[in-house]
Swiss-Prot record:
Organism ancestry: Bacteria, Pseudomonadati, Pseudomonadota, Betaproteobacteria, Burkholderiales
Function noted in UniProt: Catalyzes the attachment of threonine to tRNA(Thr) in a two-step reaction: L-threonine is first activated by ATP to form Thr-AMP and then transferred to the acceptor end of tRNA(Thr). Also edits incorrectly charged L-seryl-tRNA(Thr).
Keyword ATP-binding: yes
Compartments where found: Cytoplasm
Group of enzyme by EC: ligase
Domain TGS, residue spans: 1-66
Similarity remark: Belongs to the class-II aminoacyl-tRNA synthetase family.
Name under which the protein is recorded: Threonine--tRNA ligase
GO biological process: threonyl-tRNA aminoacylation
Record-linked Gene3D superfamilies: 3.10.20.30, 3.30.54.20, Anticodon-binding domain, Bira Bifunctional Protein, Domain 2, Threonyl-trna Synthetase, Chain A, domain 2
Subunit text: Homodimer.
Amino acid sequence: MVQITLPDGSQRQYPGPVTVAEVAQSIGTGLAKAALAGRVTVNDAEPKLVDTSFRIDQDAKLAIVTAKDADGLDLIRHSTAHLLAYAVKSLYPDAQVTIGPVIDNGFYYDFSYKRPFTPEDLQAIEKKMAELARKDEVVTREEWTRDDAVAYFKSIGENYKAEIIASIPSNEKISLYREGEFIDLCRGPHVPSTGKLKVFKLMKLAGAYWRGDSNNEMLQRIYGTAWATKDEQDAYLHMLEEAERRDHRKIGRDLDLFHFQDEGPGLIFWHPKGWTLWQQVEQYMRAVYRDNGYQEVKAPQILDLSLWKKTGHWDNYRENMFTTESENRVYGLKPMNCPGHVQIFNAGLHSYRELPLRYGEFGQCHRNEPSGSLHGMMRVRGFTQDDGHIFCTEDQLQDECADFTALLQKVYRDFGFTEVLYKVATRPEKRIGSDEIWDKAETALMESLRRTGCEFEISPGEGAFYGPKIEYTLKDAIGRHWQCGTIQVDFSMPVRLGAEYVDQNDQRRAPVMLHRAILGSLERFIGMLIENHAGAMPPWLAPVQAVVCCISEPSAEYAAKITQSLKKQGFRVQADLRGEKITRKIREHSLQKVPYILVVGDKEAQNGTVAVRGLGGLDLGAIPFDDFVARLNEDVASRRNVVQPDSKAV
């Protein structure tokens, strides 16, 4: 007798071993049809994701996985990657298959083939995939010995697959999945039949080196996406279109903010308007430092290699570091700011009464990222971090983390991000420090989030070897997630670099160090800002807050006068005194995403008014100039993120 416990706590008895599919069928035909896999738990072990054909031969807990579950969607995508390989082999028998994992929102599969695939090939492959899916062929799992599997794949000319299998220990069973005439290596699980794969689309072609090594053959990578429903896929494709429209690289060029060029790969050439935007972000964060007990510091750009060896960076990060030599000494260009802050802490002896001690820096860092990974401002080689480090005692951890989270939430709101996801990464197997210290640190992080009303996920084992951390992920205007801020507990670096304070018993102790950043890379954050706002920066951030346009030459003097008045009050304003038609001026400045366009003619000059237009179709008509000044002051003071038709709106 086998007893199956379902997620609602109900139990079902079966006379003998039973498959996941049979359990689903016994519950109802609807569930049986929707079942993609099962999540089985035996004897309180970790749940195991299995095929619907998996036979349960002892008492267990079982959850039926359908397309509505996150695991179900991953299963669909993984199985669609295999369907892609099946279709490619059907159309191009000489192609060799390699690997095909699930990635965010889809999957890819790498192939070796004698000629490059074309967009027309992609269309043919997708059509073949749909044909194979309609055949609804059963997907079956088979277990082979390693040597038999290697021999088989060599015999059919699949040398890459044979190489992968040969690297698996000889005593391990190899699982293969067969659908129709196609068989592939995979741990599984997979959908029960190809007919479960109804909604998919091939997206693009790219190159990828075998095993990520540039000395190996360049393979052809086909990317695809797959979804449970057509509505979900349509929403995703619409999001991609919107993301392309908002691409910060295009907007940066169109709005004359910055550019990139081959002579400085991964580095940014800031234009005047772009640098003005940068300065607004930096000045805002500088005020955040000042108002929240941080002391701003500045550490050197390059430091002797001996220091990077002490911190462990040279052993673990040297491939990403730039180095230089002078007078027979080797220096490392800093990839991060923390070692410099410890040196500043170590420059004097600190009492426990001085803690927590908070340092902040707009630290310029350089990392030798692979050229293929560079992506506009989102992945660069030179960047500036709003980096901060807090030196505190173990007892101060929770308060510091709670205060930081509350501060971070306010900063994100001011920049227009209202949805934040929270994740706590806990102790890995390899770590330093006692379990007691880890317990205390992890509890402090979780309690700090609870105190600030945050729901959070736990990522077991994803903390660094030197301490747990909280990751803060932003959700932007089109639903994308951006991992941004972090606060990381560090038990290691203070000890490695000899940081000490004197406790209440006159004993020297190593402080706990908290690495924290709110924006992270300012370059990346500004790229996110541009895309979140589609280039239409709110008035408090906009490089140009208003443009004053004269309708004709007689009103040019008044336009120049009020422009000067606004500039003297600290606003970023330009005058457009050209002899162009006013409709052309308005259109040009609207395309430049200027928050306010002030139109003035003879009537406005006589009455001391301005006709106010703005983003989003705003048209206030003619209002007193002083009223506009008050409105703009309110926009800046409140950091209002949308130009509102009603000046009283927030």
